[in-house]
Amino acid sequence: MATQHIENKLKLLPDLPGCYMMKDINSRIIYVGKAKNLKNRVRSYFKSSHEGKTAKLVSEIRNFETIITSTDKEAFLLEITLIQKHKPYYNIKLKRGTGYPYIKITHEKDPQLKIVSQVKKDGGYYFGPYPNVYAATETLQLLQKVYPLRRCNGYQKRPCLYYHMGQCLGACFKEVPQSEYEKQIKKIKSFLNGNVSKIKKELEQKMETASENLEFERAAEIRDQIHYVEMTVEKQKIISNDNTPRDLFAFYMNKGWLSLQIFSIRQARLMKREKRLFPCIDTPEAELESFILQFYNQKNRILPKEILVPSGMDKETLSEILGIPVKTPQRGQKRDLLEMAQKNARLVLEEKFRLLELDERKTTGAMNEITDALGLPNGHRIEAFDHSHLQGEDLVSAMVCFIDGKPEKTEYRKYKLKNVDHADEAASTREVIYRRYSRLLKEKANLPDLILMDGASIQINAAVDVLHNQLGIDIPVAGMVKNDRHKTADLMTENDEKIGLDPKSEGFYLLQRIQDEVHRFAITFHRQVRSKNSLASRLERIQGVGPKTRIKLLRNYGSLKNISAASVEDLESLGISKKVAQTIKLSLKN
């Protein structure tokens, strides 16, 4: 039986081709599959009865992810890549090879064309895998006729049968110049990379001639050959037409949230898909620019040869900083890939919003699950707090209110911190808790049944201290703790005890919703404050400071305080002229 979380996600599946990844309780991928229609295929696991291995697989599924593609053939090719990468337990048959054919040009003195089932690091050229084994075989035979290499076993003092048929260059009885092989290999590689128009045209002419001569069986054979060529070497979005290592970034923004998709194309294949989802502080383009720089600043992150990004990005500056081309494709296969990534970004964000809507309708008992877990009497009102700042500047706090498991937005509050001038979680908590509840006491308003802090013991202890020792009131306080992946994980009590909720329970969904909402609200408010006095906007107003200079200052100093503290000589060492450096110092004093 599917959990409520899975039931909700099943309602949101698209009627599109793609791949799905089934995950267990530890978020490990245990099965990868492909589908012409993701909605129908994934639902079938949970809406039908199963036996044996499939029944065991379904019993272990706790979550799933999808990647949409443009065609079911792309889904097939992506499935193979994902299986080879993740090696899911229930895809055991594909672990030692895909089971699907590749066409290989061997790395030998006298090279051959072969059909193989695995890719090896042996210097050969591999093309595929191909969904249709028969079509791949027929295409191989066509290539052997049109662009022959060696088809015999090698030198045997006399010409082989294939040489007489024009399907072997003659390694069987003579020394074949390497230049001749290289010429043929170049043509074969071009053909298998999708440049088939010349051969198709020749085949079509032969088919017409055969029809005119009433050789209908021959015409049908040629027609089938054309079909096999199209099936085998048809251009795919998941497989690019060159081996350039490239990363592709796409985004979708809505309701203050930004969804990112990162596609890593290696060896002409989509080798990795990463996704990020977070509240957007700046414009989506600026957020993505910042994200890309941080992305490649991580340890062990290797730069590709090329980066593809949406329009509106500062490609020139990104390219200068990273030292590689950053482009926005306008047409063709790369543009299609970018659109596919953007479509995936949109679906991920829409799924989040629609899941929240579905969860909101199922709040019965969710509040009680949280209070029961904390050993508290059942209540109705939760108030949650979070702080936000950037490099210790523009410090703000925000509070959201949930009544009976639903957000009560008229009760939301924003706070500009007055007594804290640097990043200090305890001090920020003390100030906002005192301001909020001293006011409620003064107004004789209703107090909440539970206070949740976005954090752990530091925030909890500071809040309890203010409530007990300064205000003399007893309101339970708990922390919302995140895991290493920055996702909601546990509750923390006033005694520093971590309490886990069932990740698929309504109580956990409510906790996750509250944490996401207070974080979003705090960041949105911080963005408003920061935009009025942000580092970027202050620098933009300084005469002589353009985009490149701004990037240099941001990368080297990070805050107005640090730039103000720098000497004119320090600024000059970044390649900034003395006049502009003096202007910067003067402007930031005001």
Curated annotation (Swiss-Prot):
CDD domains: GIY-YIG_UvrC_Cho (cd10434)
Compartments (UniProt record): Cytoplasm
GO molecular function list: DNA binding; excinuclease ABC activity
Alphabetized UniProt keyword annotations: Cytoplasm, DNA damage, DNA excision, DNA repair, Excision nuclease, SOS response
Domain GIY-YIG: 15-92
InterPro entries linked: GIY-YIG_endonuc, GIY-YIG_endonuc_sf, GIY-YIG_UvrC_Cho, RuvA_2-like, UVR_dom, UVR_dom_sf, UvrABC_protein_C, UvrC
GO biological process terms held by the UniProt record: nucleotide-excision repair; SOS response
Keyword field contains Acyltransferase: no
SUPFAM superfamilies noted in UniProt: C-terminal UvrC-binding domain of UvrB, GIY-YIG endonuclease, RuvA domain 2-like
All residue ranges annotated as the UVR domain in the record: 197-232
GO cellular component: cytoplasm; excinuclease repair complex
Purpose: The UvrABC repair system catalyzes the recognition and processing of DNA lesions. UvrC both incises the 5' and 3' sides of the lesion. The N-terminal half is responsible for the 3' incision and the C-terminal half is responsible for the 5' incision.
Annotated family: Belongs to the UvrC family.
NCBIfam families xrefs: uvrC (TIGR00194)
Subunit structure: Interacts with UvrB in an incision complex.
Protein name: UvrABC system protein C
Native species: Ligilactobacillus salivarius (strain UCC118)
Gene name as annotated: uvrC
